[in-house]
């Protein structure tokens, strides 16, 4: 892309067309497990899934109930922040569970529904059952050594949801973690 940006205009168009054609062929060859109808969501889900099964081959991921309306007014960037951080956390939790219990079932389930102007997203995943609570914080603490560089994913999700007058909540039931996000389907 950088080469295309610095080339002359005549060559740039031909090179750009060739590049886009090759990119299109590459995308066609990718194995897409998930198709929600939203290109950003589909790309993110498939990328995260393929990344996860490299280290957790038997992990199950279900996004059949993750659907977005055609008139989605929430910016793709914000959907990416919400789902990207949620999936990173869920995948990491599944890895930790597998590390402690090699025969444990690992799963991530994503779903959404719309009620009026509100969109509700829920991500449920298996985990080891260990929640580290942080004083004066609404979210669990990271257990990673570098706490300055980690542990901000849920705060980023909350900030993105806040742009749409939304909210974030989480719950634990045995060894299942559930993250719930509510958003108003309107531009901020």
Model-identified regions with their sequence ranges:
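Glycine-rich/acidic phosphate-handling loop/turn and adjacent ATP-lid/helix
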Residues: 117-151
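Short beta-to-alpha transition helix within the HATPase_c
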Residues: 18-25, 37-57, 119
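Conserved glycine-/histidine-rich ATP-lid loop and adjacent helix of the Bergerat-fold HATPase_c
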Residues: 156-165
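Histidine phosphotransfer helical core of two-component systems
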Residues: 2-39, 70-73, 103
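Conserved short strand/loop->alpha-helix "switch" segment adjacent to the catalytic nucleotide/phosphoryl-transfer site
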Residues: 33, 61-82
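Short beta-strand/loop element within the Bergerat-fold HATPase_c
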Residues: 100-117
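Glycine-rich nucleotide-binding loop
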Residues: 118, 129, 173-180
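Conserved ATP-binding N-box helix of the HATPase_c
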Residues: 2, 76-102, 158
């Amino acid at each position: 892309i950088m080469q295309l940006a610095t080339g002359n205009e005549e060559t740039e168009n031909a090179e750009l067309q060739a590049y886009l054609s090759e990119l299109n062929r590459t995308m066609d060859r990718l194995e897409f497990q998930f198709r929600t109808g939203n290109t950003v969501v589909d790309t993110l889900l498939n990328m995260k899934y393929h990344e996860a099964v490299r280290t957790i081959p038997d992990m199950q991921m279900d996004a059949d109930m993750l659907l977005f309306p055609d008139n989605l007014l929430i910016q793709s960037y914000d959907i990416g922040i919400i789902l990207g951080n949620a999936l990173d956390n869920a995948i990491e939790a599944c890895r930790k569970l597998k590390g402690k219990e090699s025969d444990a079932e690992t799963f991530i389930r994503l779903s959404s529904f719309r009620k009026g102007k509100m969109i509700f997203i829920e991500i449920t995943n298996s985990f080891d059952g260990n929640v580290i609570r942080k004083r004066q914080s609404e979210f669990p603490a990271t257990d990673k050594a570098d706490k300055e560089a980690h542990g901000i994913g849920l705060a980023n999700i909350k900030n993105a949801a806040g742009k749409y007058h939304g909210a974030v909540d989480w719950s634990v039931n045995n060894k299942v973690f559930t993250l719930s996000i509510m958003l108003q389907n309107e531009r901020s």
